[in-house]
Amino acid sequence: RTKSRGLGDVYKRQEYANTRIQGIPINREKGTAIIGHGDVKRLLLSMRSLTEAMRALILVSSEVMEKAHVGDNKSIMREGFLIPIIKGWSTELAQEVTSNGVQIHGGMGFIEETGAAQYMRDARILPIYEGTNAIQANDFMFRKTVRDNGKVAKELLEEIKIDCEDNIEISEMVNLTTKTLNYILENRDDQEMLSCISFDYLMGFGYLIGGWLMDKAKRSANKKLSESSKNEMFLKSKIISAEFYDFHILPRIEYHFKVVMKGAKVVQLTNDSFI
C-alpha cells in the first residue's frame, strides 16, 4: 500500500507539472509548464527516487522472505531485520512523497478537485496502524540490532560495502553507519537512551539500504544501455533517479546518525520539563 500510494502520486503530479502553466521559469519562454521550474523538478525527482527506493526495498525483501519461508537461516534473520525498515522507513517517506505532490499543485493541491490531498491523507495513517513507527523503531533497535550484538546489521553493512566499493558517497555512509552501530552496541545497557534515538537509527539505516539498491539499479541500467538502445528513456530515468538519490537523499543519513550519537540526552528529560 505504501508503494502504491507513492507510485500513483508520482505519475499524477508529473502529469500535472507537464500541463500547468504558471510563472516564468528561469531561461524559459512565457507560457512554459511548471515542470520548467527548478524546484518543481527537485520535488518530482525526490518523489520518484524515494518511491523507486521503497519499491526496490520491498522487492528485495520479498525475495528474502521467500528464502526464509523454506528455512534458509540467514534469510530468516535478514527478514526480521528488514521488516521494521519496510514498515517504518517506507511509511515515513510515503508522507513526504504525498506532501510534495500537494506542493507541486500549490493551492489546488489542498482542495479536493485534484485528488492530491486524498493521497496525503491516505499516507498519514500508514505510520500508525500495524504498530506505530515508534514501535517499529524500538523493535529495530532492541530485537533486531542489540539482541544479536549487531550480527545481521554487520553482515549487511559488509555486503553493501563490497557491492558499492566504487560509489564514494555510499562507501562514506557505510563507514558512518558502522561507527553509529558501534556506538549503539557500546551503550546497549542504557535502554532509555537507546529508545530516544531508535527512530533516527531506523531512518538512517533505511536511507543507506535505499541508496545501495538504487546504486544496483544504476549499474544494471548502465550495463543494459551499453548492450542495447532498447528502453533507453526508461533506463536513463533510472540512472537519473539514482544520481539524485546519491546527492539529495543519501546525505540525510549524516543528519539522522548525528542525532543518534549526540541527541539522546536532550530527550531524556523528566516529565516536568515539558510543562
Give the role of each language-model region.
Residues I21, P25, A56-E66, V102-H105, ...:
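Structured alpha-helical bundle/scaffold domains in large eukaryotic membrane-trafficking regulators
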Residues L45-R48, P84, T91, S171:
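Short amphipathic alpha-helical segments with heptad-repeat character
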Residues R5, M47-I58, S90-V97, E130, ...:
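Alpha-helical transition-metal enzyme core signature, strongest for iron centers
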Residues R147, D163-I275:
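C-terminal amphipathic alpha-helical interaction region
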Residues K30-N73, I111-I135, D139-R147:
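Acidic/histidine-rich catalytic neighborhood
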Residues K12-R48, E63-G80, I162-I168, N182-F199, ...:
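Glycine-rich cofactor-pocket loops
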Residues G80-L156, F244-L269:
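Alpha-helix capping/hinge segments and adjacent helical runs
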Residues R1-Y11:
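Single conserved hydrophobic/aromatic residue that forms the stacking wall/gate
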